[in-house]
């Protein structure tokens, strides 16, 4: 058995690491979700929670769940405080599209597209909080 000597490799810095959470197959149009995530990108965790709770859009709830999950991942996996987190990146990608048919007159059927999306949230420690 060969053992590698990793003594001169420094451990990764916790302040530079990003933690992510992904919500897949959210039954909502990516265009509608992008309207909301543009408002929270770059904000602190607590400020993003306040914004998401009081915005009148249906897309806020799955985004709120994903942001809370990313903060819980950062707290559990890296031991970062939720109060010092900022949302570094938020992305929305198109997911699979469910295709259905609506019955119409004279035996016709018109297609219906039911889009879904994937929401990815990255959080990291606030840079000004690192100098302790």
From Swiss-Prot:
GO cellular component terms, semicolon-separated: chloroplast; large ribosomal subunit
Annotated localization: Plastid, Chloroplast
GO function terms (MF aspect): rRNA binding; structural constituent of ribosome
Principal subcellular localisation of the protein: plastid
Record Pfam families: Ribosomal_L22
Keywords recorded for this protein, A-Z: Chloroplast, Plastid, Ribonucleoprotein, Ribosomal protein, RNA-binding, rRNA-binding
GO biological process per UniProt: translation
PANTHER family linked: CHLOROPLAST 50S RIBOSOMAL PROTEIN L22-RELATED (PTHR13501), LARGE RIBOSOMAL SUBUNIT PROTEIN UL22M (PTHR13501:SF10)
HAMAP family: Ribosomal_uL22_B (MF_01331_B)
Assembly information from the UniProt record: Part of the 50S ribosomal subunit.
Protein family (similarity comment): Belongs to the universal ribosomal protein uL22 family.
Reported function: This protein binds specifically to 23S rRNA. The globular domain of the protein is located near the polypeptide exit tunnel on the outside of the subunit, while an extended beta-hairpin is found that lines the wall of the exit tunnel in the center of the 70S ribosome.
Name of the featured protein: Large ribosomal subunit protein uL22c
């Amino acid at each position: 058995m060969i053992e590698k000597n990793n003594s001169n490799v420094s451990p990764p810095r916790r302040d530079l690491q990003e933690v992510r959470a992904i919500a897949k197959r959210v039954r909502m149009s990516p265009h509608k979700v992008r309207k909301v995530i543009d408002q929270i990108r770059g904000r602190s965790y607590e400020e993003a929670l306040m914004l998401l709770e009081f915005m009148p859009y249906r897309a806020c709830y799955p985004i709120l769940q994903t942001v809370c999950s990313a903060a819980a991942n950062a707290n559990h996996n890296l031991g970062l405080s939720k109060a010092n987190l900022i949302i570094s990146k938020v992305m929305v990608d198109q997911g699979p599209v469910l295709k259905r048919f609506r019955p119409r007159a004279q035996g016709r059927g018109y297609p219906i597209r039911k889009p879904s999306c994937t929401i990815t949230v990255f959080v990291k420690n606030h840079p000004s909080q690192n100098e302790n």
